[in-house]
A protein has these predicted regions:
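Long, low-complexity, charged/polar intrinsically disordered regions in eukaryotic proteins
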Residues: 1-3
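N-terminal helix-turn-helix DNA-binding core of bacterial DNA-binding proteins
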Residues: 5-46, 65-68, 72-78
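Alpha-helical residues within the helix-turn-helix
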Residues: 38, 55-56
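Residues within the DNA-recognition helix of helix-turn-helix
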Residues: 50
Length: 97
């Protein structure tokens, strides 16, 4: 019998309102924890905790980049497969309204 570990991890990660808001930010180009925390008016530590869950579920991935001043920073982006999944889920949920 199939264990459904990956499916469970992904659905659990997507079942949190804050993580869905973070995904929306990332998909809209707000992609580092500091920017996301300001956008959502949440503590950076809270955002980073939720990003770790999204990373573990392979919904987002880290992308190193440089600031204009040449400092290394970490950006996040939604994996294409995850973005497609979220879109399909949202379309199906809209049918319940």
């Amino acid at each position: 019998m199939k264990e459904y570990e990956k499916e469970s991890r992904i659905l659990k990660a997507l079942s949190d309102k804050t993580r869905l808001q973070i995904l929306e930010c990332v998909q809209n180009g707000i992609s580092n924890p500091g920017e996301i925390s300001r956008e959502l008016s949440r503590h950076r530590a809270t955002i980073e905790k939720h990003l770790r869950v999204l990373l573990a579920a392979e919904i987002v991935e880290k992308v190193p980049s440089l600031t204009r001043k040449g400092q290394l920073t970490i950006q996040y982006r939604t994996r294409k497969e995850a973005a497609d999944l979220v879109r399909v889920i949202q379309e199906h949920i809209a049918g319940f309204e």
